[in-house]
């Protein structure tokens, strides 16, 4: 018995720490730091550890299933012709959990309550999956109310009422700072894979994650999840690097809004967009977006037309001249973006983006050749690949 316990302890210690450290805007984030790593023994203990105010390194060494733990709701959801009925579509649609139904009709529905209320992550936390075993099912994570210094690494978040819009968000950032989201997988979510609230998300690095949009219920009626990333915060700096976004159909990502004092800088580097049955980037006002070394394969609309007229500033690096022109402000030659079997890429070289980026050059991560993106990203992004 003692030998078995010791073996388990040693196995956990192999994965007991965060792997690597964040680059980009979340550089310096330490999470639970030197706190003793530990795996919770019950759902109640998991919730307590994630939400309390103590520095912790929390090991997720199994599937923690929240489905059914807070009951279910049976009632009426809104069925919309374009997103729910899906006449002629290739998948089922999504009904809407909401209290109005203009232009639609009410239908009976039943959804799980746990997914509607995320776990509020306290400051100074590292939530780390063990090998490929770390799964949080039926509930998301939220960093808000001034909490900061959080690492979420090597976790699969899945099954948050995927058949319903507003069924749940996987990761929420609202009045937060210094968050590193790394080597996770997100799948089968009702609404957003990652969403910011109206407050600031702060300094965030989203790296090496797999956003898996394959689903039986799609608002795009095509078996691809629509609600991918919605970034709206008041004062946000995003490094988005090495992520694999596949089989999604929209908001991949959407950023910016004129409804708040939103100010967003977004550096997207070496991401792989694959089989996107709608649009990838959708950029609104009050944003500065630098895109380099991203690979778009079978993407209907890599960058929406509205992105060019909504007021945001973009540097899309689509020509040799644009790549070389980075050097004057940034001190390096940008990597161009590549398309394969995809819609047209829009050429924008707003100088304001380079000027903005030059103020924090130390937070701009390096790139590798865009031709290497598909193989490298698929090999590295997601759980169990640390």
Curated annotation (Swiss-Prot):
Active-site positions on this chain: 251
Any one biological process term the GO annotation gives: cell wall organization
GO cellular component, one term: extracellular region
UniProt superkingdom: Eukaryota
Keyword Cytoplasm attached: no
Signal peptide (from-to): 1-16
Residues the record marks as carrying a glycan: 124
Disulfide bonds: 77-101, 326-334
Catalysed reactions, semicolon-separated: Eliminative cleavage of (1->4)-alpha-D-galacturonan methyl ester to give oligosaccharides with 4-deoxy-6-O-methyl-alpha-D-galact-4-enuronosyl groups at their non-reducing ends
Enzyme class: lyase
Main location, first listed in the record: secreted
Localization terms from the record: Secreted
Record family assignment: Belongs to the polysaccharide lyase 1 family.
Function: Pectinolytic enzymes consist of four classes of enzymes: pectin lyase, polygalacturonase, pectin methylesterase and rhamnogalacturonase. Among pectinolytic enzymes, pectin lyase is the most important in depolymerization of pectin, since it cleaves internal glycosidic bonds of highly methylated pectins.
Annotated protein name in UniProt: Probable pectin lyase E
Species the sequence originates in: Aspergillus fumigatus (strain CBS 144.89 / FGSC A1163 / CEA10)
């Amino acid at each position: 018995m003692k030998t078995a316990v010791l073996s388990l302890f040693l196995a956990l210690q192999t994965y007991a720490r965060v792997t690597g450290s964040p680059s980009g805007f979340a550089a310096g984030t330490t999470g639970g730091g030197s706190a003793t790593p530990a795996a919770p023994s019950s759902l109640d203990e998991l919730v307590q550890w994630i939400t309390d105010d103590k520095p912790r390194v929390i090991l997720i060494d199994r599937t923690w299933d929240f489905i059914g733990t807070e009951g279910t709701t049976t009632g009426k959801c809104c069925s919309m012709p374009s997103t729910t009925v899906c006449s002629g579509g290739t998948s089922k649609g999504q009904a809407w959990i909401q209290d109005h139904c203009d232009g639609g009709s009410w239908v009976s529905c039943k959804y799980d309550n746990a997914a509607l209320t995320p776990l509020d992550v306290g400051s100074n936390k590292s939530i780390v999956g063990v090998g490929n075993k770390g799964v949080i099912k039926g509930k998301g994570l939220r960093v808000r109310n001034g909490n900061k210094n959080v690492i979420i690494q090597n976790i699969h978040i899945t099954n948050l009422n995927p058949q319903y819009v507003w069924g749940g968000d996987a990761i929420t950032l609202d009045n937060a700072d210094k968050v590193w989201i790394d080597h996770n997988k997100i799948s089968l979510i009702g609404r957003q894979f990652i969403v910011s609230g109206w407050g600031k998300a702060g300094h965030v690095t989203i790296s090496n994650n797999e956003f898996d949009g394959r689903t039986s219920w799609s608002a795009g009626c095509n078996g691809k999840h629509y609600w991918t990333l919605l970034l709206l915060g008041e004062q946000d700096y995003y490094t988005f690097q090495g992520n694999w976004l596949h089989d999604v159909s929209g908001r991949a990502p959407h950023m910016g809004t004129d409804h708040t004092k939103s100010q967003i800088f977004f550096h997207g580097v070496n991401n792989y967009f694959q089989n996107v049955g709608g649009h990838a980037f959708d950029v609104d006002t009050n944003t500065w977006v630098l895109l380099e070394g991203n690979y778009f394969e079978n993407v209907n609309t890599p960058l929406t037309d509205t992105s060019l007229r909504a007021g945001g500033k973009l540097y899309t690096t689509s020509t040799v001249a644009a790549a070389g022109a980075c050097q004057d402000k940034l001190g390096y030659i940008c990597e161009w973006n590549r398309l394969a079997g995809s819609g047209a890429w829009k050429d924008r070289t707003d100088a304001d983006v380079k000027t903005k980026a030059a103020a924090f050059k130390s937070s701009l991560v390096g790139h590798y050749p865009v031709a290497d993106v598909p193989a490298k990203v698929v090999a590295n992004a997601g759980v169990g690949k640390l």
